[in-house]
Amino acid sequence: WPPVEDRPCCERCTACTLMLPDEANTCVCGDIVPKCHQGCSLCERVDTPSGYQCKSFEYYNCGTKCP
């Protein structure tokens, strides 16, 4: 799995796999963003001003707000 510092940030992970160690987990991010992060395999438009949500399980830094 990718090193933590190379992962996209996600303030609110809504679903995660249950693996050990924690770094091995992939999650679905509940954040609504202006543009999906690079590597998101399922990016969907949502009906809000800022626009998109990555709906696929990806490696994230959960609980971190993007700068």
Swiss-Prot record:
Coiled coil: none
Residues marked Reactive bond for trypsin (site): L18, M19
Tissue: Expressed in bulb (at protein level).
GO cellular component, one term: extracellular region
Any GO BP: negative regulation of endopeptidase activity
Single GO molecular function: serine-type endopeptidase inhibitor activity
Superkingdom field: Eukaryota
InterPro entries assigned: Bowman-Birk_prot_inh, Prot_inh_BBI
Disulfide bonds: C9-C66, C10-C29, C13-C62, C16-C27, C36-C43, C40-C54
Keywords for the protein's UniProt record, in alphabetical order: Disulfide bond, Protease inhibitor, Serine protease inhibitor
Annotated function: Serine protease inhibitor. Strongly inhibits trypsin (Ki = 4 nM) and elastase (Ki = 4.8 nM). Also inhibits chymotrypsin with a Ki of 22 nM. Does not inhibit bacterial subtilisin.
Assigned protein family: Belongs to the Bowman-Birk serine protease inhibitor family.
Protein name, per record: Bowman-Birk type proteinase inhibitor A6
The species this protein was found in: Hyacinthus orientalis (Common hyacinth)
